[in-house]
């Protein structure tokens, strides 16, 4: 998820590669878009223009439910569908999913995949007790049309009572409602499968007249809202910036994957940097319309650990609308501008839908007859082979997946605690990269041995920086010392560090996992929060013990490897720990724990190297 993680990547570049231009190592390249892809900016229409649009829509022969429709609460009916993975509550008001719960489920190899890990709700259905996490933020998922951008995220259809028919045998729910003038019927079928994390949605438009019906056209665009902003979200406090940074929308268009934060401008982070230096305002309109002749492959919404994807199976929507208004919850909205029905014709739109964890294990089919890669006539025939890009982390994805696999094996076969798993993994990582780390330690030791001579050069040429630099480089060359030898091993490992961050930040296994005094390895280690500070912060400032320990070990390591140098260079040596404190202050404590223990191991390795060098020097002196 390039746009959402780019700030972190930039910080890591500045911290680890401050002396070297290695930016291109860190960021997965954005796939090249075809020349057929178009981006159209859509601004919120004025009142006069909106009246004209509505007039044109009436002339183009499409009707929508009236805003004056009255709803009688008793007319709203609810029903539940329970599968191994889901508990789904439906409402006849709008014919929609009103609540969507995910549960623990069985993986393809029979393993239990824990999903309801943190603050699960207790649900009693037919006398049985279940535990689930509600993902629709209790605002539901629609699959309803609207022809007005101003109605996003809630369609007028959401206020219309639908008839409800349920077939418990095959876990299907069917809703239907008529347009106010009875010219067409909207029918929605939700079908679930007991052991699968996929379900199928069919939206049908039925022409009830003996005339041709233009349901969607260039003049009368229809917007289909599938999934809204995804949860879960904290119920005991308001959302903060750290929370909202994990809520995003994504789409796959013309072979290119893109994502943006919920309710944010579609101008990306790097584009905003370019706009700053070029003087371009970069301001987005209220809505951005992405269209293409190739159509939309799939679209969805996501949060830190979960995604919801709608994959059109038998058709390609003409585009996707991005709602850029602050704090909107419009989610994934598909665009249709070419639906015409003959007399009595039924027009079906089939979707394969997935709601679950952001891991490939969740997208594996259990039943071969449902798997479109194994069964030609599967209900999910036409499923996109690129759905895994919904949680793709770029070029570091293979490393991330490998790290998660190793962590799970350590957890399984040693101590069943992810804190200890991270520590054991840090030791294994240090052993694997021992040759590089040892080269770094030896390089720093050589620099220390030259400390007296460097001090002499600095004092002698204190007022001549050019000559001081020249003499310093001559000293390095004479003693066969590479001044960047200590940095190179770290630079080589940077892609691995990025993979470690994504592994520790996004894997659901760390969610609500405690370690020693740390309550949750997926959250910052806040041991105390100050009272609110007027005019500065309304929530107080958290004290993160693990982050302080991390920067303490970083400073100690820096002092161990420091050599004589001028004051400016000495100041640079302490820039990294300060930057690291800023970066890690609000990071998941699992990441901070790993980095802290890596520092401890590096300190130990440097001490052993220094001790061995001293012993060797004494032997040579004798």
Swiss-Prot record:
Protein's GO biological process: protein insertion into membrane; protein transport
Major location category of this protein: membrane
Organism: Leptospira borgpetersenii serovar Hardjo-bovis (strain JB197)
CDD domains listed in its UniProt record: 5TM_YidC_Alb3
GO molecular-function term, one example from the UniProt record: membrane insertase activity
Pfam families: 60KD_IMP (PF02096)
One Gene Ontology cellular component: plasma membrane
Family (UniProt): Belongs to the OXA1/ALB3/YidC family. Type 1 subfamily.
Keywords: Cell inner membrane, Cell membrane, Chaperone, Membrane, Protein transport, Transmembrane, Transmembrane helix, Transport
Keyword rRNA processing recorded: no
Protein name: Membrane protein insertase YidC
Keyword match Protein transport: yes
InterPro entries, per the entry: Membr_insert_YidC, YidC/ALB3/OXA1/COX18, YidC/Oxa/ALB_C, YidC_ALB_C, YidC_periplasmic_sf
UniProt function note: Required for the insertion and/or proper folding and/or complex formation of integral membrane proteins into the membrane. Involved in integration of membrane proteins that insert both dependently and independently of the Sec translocase complex, as well as at least some lipoproteins. Aids folding of multispanning membrane proteins.
Disordered: annotated span: 33-70
Coiled coil: none
Bias (Basic and acidic residues) ranges: 33-61
Compartments (UniProt record): Cell inner membrane
Subunit structure, interactors included: Interacts with the Sec translocase complex via SecD. Specifically interacts with transmembrane segments of nascent integral membrane proteins during membrane integration.
């Amino acid at each position: 998820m390039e746009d959402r993680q780019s700030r972190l990547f930039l910080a890591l570049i500045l911290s680890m590669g401050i002396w070297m231009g290695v930016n291109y190592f860190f960021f997965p390249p954005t796939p090249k878009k075809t020349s057929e892809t178009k981006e159209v900016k859509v601004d919120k229409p004025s009142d006069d223009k909106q009246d004209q649009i509505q007039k044109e829509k009436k002339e183009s022969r499409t009707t929508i439910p009236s805003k004056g429709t009255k709803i009688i609460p008793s007319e709203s009916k609810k029903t539940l569908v329970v599968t191994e993975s889901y508990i789904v509550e439906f409402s006849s008001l709008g014919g929609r999913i009103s609540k969507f719960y995910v549960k623990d489920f069985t993986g393809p190899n029979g393993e239990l995949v824990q999903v309801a890990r943190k603050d699960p709700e207790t649900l009693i259905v037919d006398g049985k007790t279940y535990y689930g996490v509600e993902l629709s933020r209790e605002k539901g998922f629609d699959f309803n049309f609207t022809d007005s951008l101003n109605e996003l995220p809630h369609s007028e259809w959401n206020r219309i009572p639908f008839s409800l028919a349920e077939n418990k045998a095959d876990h299907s729910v069917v809703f239907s409602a008529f347009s106010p003038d009875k010219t067409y019927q909207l029918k929605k079928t939700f079908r679930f499968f007991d052991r699968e994390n996929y379900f199928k949605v069919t939206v049908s438009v039925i022409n009830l007249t003996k005339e041709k019906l233009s349901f969607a056209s260039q003049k009368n665009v229809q917007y289909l809202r599938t999934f809204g902003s995804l949860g879960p979200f904290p119920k005991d406090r308001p959302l903060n910036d750290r929370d909202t940074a994990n809520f995003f929308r994504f789409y796959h268009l013309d072979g290119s994957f893109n994502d943006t934060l919920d309710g944010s401008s579609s101008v990306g982070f790097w584009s905003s940097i370019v706009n700053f230096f070029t003087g371009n305002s970069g301001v987005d309109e209220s809505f951005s319309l992405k269209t293409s002749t190739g159509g939309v492959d799939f679209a969805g919404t996501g949060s830190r650990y979960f995604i919801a994807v709608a994959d059109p199976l038998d058709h390609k929507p003409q585009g996707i609308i991005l709602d850029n208004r602050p704090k909107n919850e419009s989610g994934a909205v598909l665009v249709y501008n070419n639906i015409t029905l003959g007399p009595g014709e039924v027009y079906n739109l089939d979707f394969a839908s997935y709601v679950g964890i952001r891991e490939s294990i969740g997208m594996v089919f259990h039943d071969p007859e449902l798997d479109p890669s194994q069964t030609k006539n599967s209900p999910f025939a036409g499923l996109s082979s690129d759905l895994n890009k919904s949680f793709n982390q770029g070029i570091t994805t293979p490393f991330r997946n490998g790290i998660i696999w190793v962590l799970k094996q350590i957890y399984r076969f040693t101590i069943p605690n992810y804190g200890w798993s991270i520590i054991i993994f840090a030791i294994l990582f240090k052993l694997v990269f021992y040759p590089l780390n040892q080269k770094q330690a030896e390089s720093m030791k050589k620099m220390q041995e030259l400390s007296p001579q460097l001090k002499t050069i600095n004092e002698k040429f204190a007022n001549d920086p050019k000559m001081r630099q020249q003499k310093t480089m001559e000293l390095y060359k004479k003693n066969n010392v590479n001044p960047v030898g200590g940095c190179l091993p770290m630079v080589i490992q940077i892609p691995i560090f990025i993979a470690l961050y994504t592994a520790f930040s996004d894997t659901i296994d760390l969610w609500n996992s405690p370690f020693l005094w740390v309550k949750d390895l997926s959250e910052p280690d806040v041991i105390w929060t100050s009272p609110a500070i007027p005019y500065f912060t309304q929530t107080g400032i958290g004290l993160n013990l693990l982050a302080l320990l991390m920067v303490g070990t970083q400073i100690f390591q820096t002092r161990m490897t420091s050599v004589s140098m001028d004051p400016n260079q000495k100041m640079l040596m302490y820039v990294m720990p300060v930057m690291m404190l800023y970066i890690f202050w609000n990071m998941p404590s699992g990441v901070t724990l790993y980095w802290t223990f890596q520092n401890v191991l590096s300190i130990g390795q440097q001490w052993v190297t220094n001790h061995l060098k001293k012993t060797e020097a004494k032997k040579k002196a004798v």
